[in-house]
Design a protein with these regions (language model features):
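Acidic catalytic motifs of isoprenoid enzymes
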Residues: 1-183, 190, 194-231, 239-249, ...
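Low-complexity, proline/glycine-enriched hydrophobic segments characteristic of transmembrane helices
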Residues: 274-282
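Short, highly charged C-terminal tails/helix-capping segments
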Residues: 256-257
């Protein structure tokens, strides 16, 4: 998906990172089991964050094992899975499918069309199971596409619609925590959308693609404007997050929310300001485990 909910590894304890990594690898294994290699390819920071948060909140009974994977055959990784991992895998696969469909719709990316087609077939069993969620998400995406077609530059409006998608993703159960999870997912979705739009605006304008910031990206105060918009939504997300009774994973989840989530934004801001260096996390080898990104800093799918 988007890949902004990543850890700031230098600020983590080793045991916190190992715990996070075990959820990441667990999600990877379930994606492969349920959706094959295509599902495994969709593995994302977003899915790992969702999985880690819900597993802690609902105190799911973990099954812990070790395995080697194709990417790192010489090293065994701890794998942590439970019933919540299944849900996170379902949401990860569905949102990846919608993202690939959007890539094909916007840019005619052949890879997006192929992966979306494969995922469409592999997620058919989820259509009835999550019919209500899918209906809300599909409607929000359709509304976003209509705004794009109109050319209207409305960053808050677009962020609001993507927030509706993520609200559905985080609403795991109809219970006492649903209202907080919905608010959290909604605001996190807005943050992620705005960060992605900020990072991509120059490339989008150059290639003639829609971007909600295209009217303001040349302003001298653009970074401050975008940062302020994002901060408002992130603060509201954090307020909802802190109302959840999280224990085991709360430290690394806070690391992501209060620090890691800003890494790519700060890199993009540094490039635009012409800075020779940017003070950001050195998230180790980008091809290793949950820290792998492509050459542009975007997240890649892959194994644990």
């Amino acid at each position: 998906m988007f890949g902004y909910t990543t850890v700031n590894k230098p600020e983590m304890k080793f045991k916190e990172y190992d715990l996070y990594h075990s959820y990441y690898c667990g999600l990877c294994s379930v994606l492969k089991k349920k959706f094959g290699l295509t599902g495994e390819f969709t593995l994302s920071y977003d899915g790992a964050f969702l999985c880690s948060l819900l597993c802690d909140l609902y105190d799911a009974q973990d099954e812990i094992s070790e395995r080697r994977c194709a990417v790192h055959p010489g090293v065994k990784h701890v794998i942590r899975t439970n019933v919540v991992t299944d849900y996170a895998a379902d949401m990860n696969a569905l949102m990846a499918m919608f993202k690939c469909q959007d890539d094909w719709h916007d840019d005619k990316k052949l890879s997006g069309k192929i992966i979306a087609g494969l995922l469409n077939g592999k997620t058919k069993s989820l259509r009835d199971k999550y019919a209500d969620k899918i209906a809300v998400i599909t409607k929000a995406i359709d509304d976003m596409n209509e705004i794009e077609k109109s050319g209207k530059t409305d960053p808050e409006g677009m962020a609001f619609l993507f927030g509706k998608c993520m609200s559905e993703v985080y609403a795991y159960k109809n219970d006492e925590w649903e209202k907080y999870l919905r608010v959290f997912g909604d605001r996190l979705g807005r943050v992620v959308y705005l960060m992605d739009a900020y990072e991509d605006v120059y490339a989008d304008v150059k290639k003639g693609r829609y971007n909600p910031f295209s009217d303001v990206y040349e302003r001298s105060d653009f970074e401050g404007l975008a940062r302020e918009m994002i901060t408002v939504h992130l603060e509201e997300a954090c307020v909802a997050f802190e109302k959840l009774p999280l224990i085991e994973n709360v430290d690394f989840l806070r690391n992501i929310l209060y620090s890691g989530i800003w890494i790519r934004f700060n890199i993009a801001a540094g490039k635009r300001s012409g800075a020779s260096s940017v003070e950001v996390s050195d998230n180790e080898d980008r091809k290793d485990g949950p820290d792998k990104t492509d050459k542009d800093g975007k997240e890649e799918g892959g194994q644990s």
